């Protein structure tokens, strides 16, 4: 995941070097997501059929190829190709990697895999942005140092995966289908649909930071220090990692509710920072919003992981990432297309207002759901989940969760995890 955020702090340098617009920056960012979603739709469930190890090995070799293209890039076309290959590599790996971490979780700590997935994603993205941001300020050609090192790292990781034990026994005689589809098993559907509003809100603010924050910091907040954009991105993701670990101490409902509140407050802070403008307020907004992303994301991954089986796990996690990365890319691409006409300041302000609206939607959705069990699952009859699924089938959107109260612990307090 460090590789996904590594190009972001370098985008302003690429713009100076090859003279392209903010719109092209978001296009370069968007093709990464196109490649990622294409791989998720076709290759995401393959690790359930072939096993985790061969899929991860292929993904690491593709990732090494993408960083090698970045390393030797000579123009915008090279960036587009490298970012697309990088997206395919990430999409190939990410469903199987999340499922594999759940496979390795012990019976005593069943949420360890999903916690590692959520926190590891945040820490990796933070590390990539922070290190590259500091290199932008320190050396003349940071891309040469970054992508040559990452190419070597991916090759070493491929060697390590070669010796990794396999966790899935591939079913004999079952054909591998690469049809682009996402299927959510019935038993996982109600939890998946309940997670959608928070996933969309969190990943939309992530898209703002990965695609536009270095340009916003320089062009709207008027910060000339080259590392500032990368450090703001790192602040968002480090806070997300802390929020992810914090969410393990709460029920899913409580974690998601608190996360939605923080996302709303963080979005408001970002809007104020852009209006003033204030780099300090922007950084504070990044921290608050990042904590909200971590809380909601980890809580929902935890809940979804509990209602999947080993055979369907990577397929379900692939669907989670399809929703997440669509939210990551589409608003950012729209902002890039609108920026030349409306200006970067107005566009970024409207962007964070959009994120704040989504956060409020997630907050209302979670507040109306009174699921208090260890995973936030309805403790009454399964009719609540059936109603949610039926509502989604009629309208094409996730309906509100049906209110049920789960029994409290012996001391009268709601059940907790951790």
Give the location of each predicted region.
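Helix-breaking motifs and short loop linkers at transmembrane-helix boundaries and internal kinks
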Residues: 19, 51, 72-77, 273-277
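Helix-loop-helix hairpin linking two adjacent transmembrane segments in secondary transporters
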Residues: 112, 116-162
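C-terminal transmembrane helical hairpin of 12-TM major facilitator-type secondary transporters
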Residues: 255-298
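Symmetry-related core transmembrane helices of the 12-TM Major Facilitator Superfamily/SLC fold
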Residues: 145-160, 348-364
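Conserved MFS/SLC helix-loop-helix module at the cytosolic interface between two early adjacent transmembrane helices
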Residues: 37-74
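Paired small-residue
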Residues: 77-86, 280-288
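Cytoplasmic helix-loop-helix junction between adjacent transmembrane helices
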Residues: 84-120
């Amino acid at each position: 995941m460090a590789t996904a955020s590594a190009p972001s702090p370098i985008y302003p340098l690429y713009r100076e070097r090859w003279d392209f617009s903010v719109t092209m920056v978001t296009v370069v960012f968007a093709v990464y997501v196109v490649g990622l979603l294409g791989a998720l739709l076709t290759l995401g469930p393959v690790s359930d059929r072939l096993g985790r190890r061969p899929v991860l090995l292929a993904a690491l070799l593709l990732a090494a190829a993408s960083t090698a293209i970045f390393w030797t890039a000579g123009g915008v076309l090279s960036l587009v190709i490298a970012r697309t290959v990088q997206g395919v590599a990430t999409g190939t790996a990410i469903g199987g990697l999340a499922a594999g971490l759940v496979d390795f979780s012990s019976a005593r700590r069943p949420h360890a895999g999903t916690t590692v997935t959520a926190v590891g994603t945040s820490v990796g993205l933070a590390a990539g942005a922070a290190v590259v941001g500091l290199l932008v300020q320190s050396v003349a050609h940071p891309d040469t140092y970054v992508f040559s090192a990452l190419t070597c790292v991916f090759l070493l990781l491929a060697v390590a995966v070669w010796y990794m034990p396999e966790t899935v026994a591939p079913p004999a005689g079952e054909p591998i289908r690469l049809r682009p589809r996402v299927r959510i098993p019935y038993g996982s559907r109600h939890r998946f649909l309940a997670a959608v509003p928070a996933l969309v809100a969190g990943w939309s603010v992530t898209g703002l930071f990965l695609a536009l924050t270095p340009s916003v910091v320089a062009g709207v907040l008027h910060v000339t220090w080259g590392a500032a954009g990368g450090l703001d991105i790192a602040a968002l993701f480090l806070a997300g990692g802390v929020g992810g670990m914090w969410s393990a101490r709460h029920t899913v409902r409580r974690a998601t509710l608190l996360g939605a509140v923080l996302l709303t407050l963080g979005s408001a802070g970002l809007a104020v920072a852009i209006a003033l403008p204030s780099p300090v307020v922007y950084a504070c907004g990044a921290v608050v919003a990042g904590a909200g992303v971590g809380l909601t994301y980890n809580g929902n991954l935890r809940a979804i992981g509990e209602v999947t089986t080993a055979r369907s796990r990577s397929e379900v996690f692939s669907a989670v990432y399809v929703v997440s990365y669509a939210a990551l890319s589409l608003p950012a691409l729209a902002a890039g297309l609108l920026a030349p006409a409306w200006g970067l300041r107005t566009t970024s302000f409207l962007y964070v207002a959009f994120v704040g609206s989504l956060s409020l939607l997630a907050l209302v959705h979670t507040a109306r759901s009174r699921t208090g069990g260890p995973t936030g699952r309805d403790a009454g009859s399964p009719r609540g989940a059936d109603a949610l699924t039926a509502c989604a089938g009629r309208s094409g959107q996730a309906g509100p969760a049906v209110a049920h109260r789960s029994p409290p612990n012996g001391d009268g307090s709601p059940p907790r995890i951790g």
